[in-house]
């Protein structure tokens, strides 16, 4: 029979997963707000920064984040275009303007610095082990849900 740690001495696994998620979300929200962005605007900006992309391809690339209430990212593209950060080619492809590239670079630098703080103190081996364990746990849960 599996032995479980005494929750009076160690908080349960689910507590830490939720707490880490909450803290990462809050950190990202604060960093992006410094640049006038929210998570969805950042995802759109980050995707367009990878190279020209059509609006339909952008929706497909970020489809996991869309819903019946939010079926397209066009309102976010329009917001970025109003800021002068995104332009549309004659074919409709979206690209970052010079101002958009500058804004993206500033936000990206802050996001990367924040992400580095998340894993500060972990060796590359620790990080690889953590990622492997989380992936295996997710796989276990996926198998359990499918059963």
Predicted regions, residues:
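N-terminal leader segment of winged-helix/HTH proteins
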Residues: 1-39
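Residues at secondary-structure transition points
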Residues: 8, 15, 39, 68-71, ...
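C-terminal regulatory/oligomerization modules of transcriptional regulators
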Residues: 1-5, 53, 128-147
């Amino acid at each position: 029979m599996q032995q479980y740690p005494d929750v009076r001495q160690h908080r349960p696994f689910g507590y830490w997963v939720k707490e880490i998620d909450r803290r990462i979300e809050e950190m990202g929200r604060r960093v992006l707000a410094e640049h006038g962005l929210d998570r969805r605007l950042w995802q759109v900006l980050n995707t367009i920064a990878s190279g020209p992309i059509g609006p339909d391809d952008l929706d497909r690339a970020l489809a996991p984040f869309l819903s019946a209430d939010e079926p397209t990212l066009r309102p976010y593209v329009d917001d970025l275009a109003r800021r002068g950060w995104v332009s549309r080619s004659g074919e409709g492809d979206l690209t970052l303007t010079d101002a958009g590239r500058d804004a993206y670079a500033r936000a990206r630098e802050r996001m990367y610095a924040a992400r580095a703080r998340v894993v500060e103190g972990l060796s590359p081996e620790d990080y690889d082990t953590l990622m492997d364990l989380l992936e295996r746990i997710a796989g276990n849960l996926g198998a359990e849900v499918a059963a």
